């Protein structure tokens, strides 16, 4: 009886200590469901890029532009996609009237070109990007859905910078916002293709 009590007490102490053995697949699921807040809203890894982006108050301009360009269905698709998502503040850095002009129906092709320049095929987390930079000797080229390239550099631990075809740079301010169909990295400037 004493042995049984001791064994039960030890098992209870182990359980109450919070130490638990969780199968790897359950751990993966728990990590996958970890949310990140962007623009005051939780971003759920079980939702797609559009389902999450529409809830971020910091990305209303981007969402409006995606709708105007007719890219909603694409970004709701299976992907996977890596999206460098400029904030409203990033769009605000463009010359006055630029966004209003771009969302006009007659400028849809130009808007689509700019937006697809922010999208890279595949799921590139910050770890993947930093590895590509390391393997590239300090920088990495990423081919965008638009067809042109972005340059990624690392400046300090975990700080990623994106350079566009015009030489403008944007900092990744929030990395690894996981989506069911890819990953979003929030950036502080709009990236522009060469043409």
Say what each PLM segment does.
Residues 6-14:
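Sec-dependent N-terminal signal peptides
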Residues 16-24:
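C-terminal segment of classical bacterial N-terminal signal peptides
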Residues 2-5, 25-195:
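Mature, structured domains of secreted/extracytosolic soluble proteins
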Residues 5-6, 20:
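Generic extreme N-terminus detector
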Residues 11-12, 20, 119, 133:
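Generic low-complexity, intrinsically disordered sequence content enriched
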């Amino acid at each position: 009886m004493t042995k049984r009590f001791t064994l039960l007490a030890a098992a209870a102490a182990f359980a109450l200590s919070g130490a638990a053995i969780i199968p790897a697949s359950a751990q993966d699921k728990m990590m996958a469901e970890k949310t990140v807040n962007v623009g005051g809203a939780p971003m759920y890894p079980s939702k797609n890029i559009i389902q999450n982006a529409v809830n971020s108050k910091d990305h209303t301009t981007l969402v409006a532009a995606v709708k105007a360009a007719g890219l909603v269905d694409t970004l709701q698709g299976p992907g996977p996609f890596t999206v460098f998502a400029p904030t409203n503040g990033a769009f605000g850095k463009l010359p006055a009237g630029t966004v209003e002009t771009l969302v006009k129906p007659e400028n849809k092709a130009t808007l689509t070109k700019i937006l697809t320049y922010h999208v890279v095929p595949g799921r590139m987390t910050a770890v993947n990007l930093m590895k590509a930079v390391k393997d590239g000797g300090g920088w990495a080229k990423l081919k965008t859905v638009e067809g042109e390239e972005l340059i990624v550099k690392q400046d300090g631990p975990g700080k990623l910078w994106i350079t566009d075809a015009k030489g403008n740079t944007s900092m990744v301010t929030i990395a690894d916002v996981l989506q069911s169909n890819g990953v979003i990295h929030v950036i502080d400037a709009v990236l522009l293709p060469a043409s």
